[in-house]
Amino acid sequence: MFRKTAFGRAAVLAASTAIVLGAAVMGSAAQDKTTITFANWATAEAATRPGIEEVIANFEKANPDIDVQSETISFSEIARQLVLRIRSGNPPDVAQVAGNDTLLLAATGGLEPLSTIAADTVANLKPGSLSGLEVDGSLVALPWNQAPAGFWYNKAIMEKAGLDPENPPKTIDELNAALKSIKESQPDVIPLGVDTTNRAFSLSSNWPWMLTFGAKPVGADATGAESAEMKAYLTWMRDLAEKGYIEVGRKIGEFRPLIAQDKVAFLWDQVLVQGVIQTTNKMSDEDFYKHYGVTVMPTGAAGKSFSFEGGHQLVMFKDSEKKEAAWKFMNFLATDPGAIKTYTIGYNRSLPPVAQTDDEELKKLLDTPVFNTYSNDIIPTIAPQPYGPQFAAAATAIMAGVQEAVTSSRPIDEIAASIQQQLSR
């Protein structure tokens, strides 16, 4: 009895010791893990949530010593919340940003410079992918995915108008002539889809057109709203509206299903257009490429095309105490072949910033007429936007003037003067 009891006690003691040791090992492993926070709106939107969650899970599997804590914030709120968190000394480690928000955050001084840590990655990025992401010579954001605007054209509509469907307009003069032919031959078709709403995105979208006319109403090297170039742009926009070449007041997204239904001839829009068209009309890739094409913006007097970047960026914060892990995650999101296939192309319908890849499957996915045109021809034409603390106010003033130009008969000189008056406040 004594021997049995002693043996039982020894067994219990051994089991207890094993449990304690196991718990200690597990606790030690947990303590060895680094947890980083990732503020983003990708998890806030149903269209992208599954993709980003899958990519985060794959990153954690490949990096078992790092946990990613996703912080969901809506697109409309993320910039404001990040500024507040920088000021309170409690920012996330990494955040998803876009457009003017990137420069607003940089202006706080709260972003970690990336020039050194990202040097090897930057060496394999496409020319033009860093446009607008450097402040005082320092890289403040890593391009995550790219969605610049291109000049889409409907070959079937062009052919009906007697135009060469394989030769889209290369200059503003050629564009004007093509718009006239399309309107005369197909009066129910919208010749050109452009965003003329009064919002910040609309200024971003119209900025390349302004540059085509040599206009720089605001920003670095601004020549003002009363310049001859800005008046020429406003006059051109009025002419398009008066002749019925554009449909005023529509957001750019409203034209996407219409071009899929052969109701829009030319569309100034991003790379995601192909996905929208094929989802709408169920076209095969082969039929799509026979029916649609994309190229660079028609040039003005300077003979140069322009575009704008509508993609997303990743930033790291100075107050992060886990910069090594944060960078590893950022680099994974932007450059890992699996992440690119799953999220960038699969869910976000955009392009990766990387110039080359050794992944054969990814090479095949990227080797399409549309992706090649964007990567090789359009991305190099991306022009910096007039981003800064006053961008939103400037957008309101400028686009209000554009709207007045396309909807009223008020003299262009007066409209330009009104824009300038608001910009000077």
Task: Give a label for each model feature.
Residues 37-40, 69-71, 93-96, 141-143, ...:
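Structural recognition of the beta-strand scaffold that forms the well-ordered cores
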Residues 159, 165, 360-361, 377-425:
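Conserved C-terminal helix/tail region of periplasmic/extracytoplasmic solute-binding proteins
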Residues 54-125, 134, 160-162, 167-170, ...:
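Extracytoplasmic "Venus flytrap"/periplasmic binding protein-like
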Residues 2-5, 9-17, 26-104, 165, ...:
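Conserved N-terminal structural module of periplasmic/extracytoplasmic solute-binding proteins
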Residues 176-181, 220-249:
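Glycine-centered hinge/linker elements that transmit conformational signals in sensory
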Residues 98-150, 176, 190, 202-205, ...:
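Hinge/lid segment of periplasmic solute-binding proteins
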Residues 105-109, 129-167, 195-219, 308-317, ...:
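Periplasmic solute-binding protein
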Residues 272-289, 300-400:
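C-terminal lobe and pocket-closing loops
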